[in-house]
Amino acid sequence: VLVDAPCSGLGSPRRRPGARWRRTAKDVNELAELQRELLTSALATVRPGGVVAYTTCSPHVLETEYVVRDVTRRLDRRGQRVEVLHAGNAATRLAPRPPAGAERRMLQLWPHLEGTDAMFCALLRRVD
């Protein structure tokens, strides 16, 4: 299941140069809450053993790593196990050259390093 979450767009300045001036802290917080809801719903929908790819075009930790952390902690407290797979390893196998930060479980691409938007990807497997 792919969750290509609506985000602030802060990671795509080439395509949306004004995004950083139009977004407020409140916008980012509201988007992060929506992102947590979407990721939680996707993990509830996928069968045990299934994988959810959570992606955004934002480099903001409130929309990326914190969303994954918050959702996995919340589900863990409910007794639902989710494993964060190694997205960096997956990207290394698929890309013509390893992206910067490929050693990390959650992958953050940067425009100045990869020539892409600031894309984020986390792969989560529902354990039970």
Residues covered by each model-derived region:
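Mobile active-site "lid"/loop adjacent to the S-adenosyl-L-methionine
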Residues: 4-41, 47, 53, 58-63
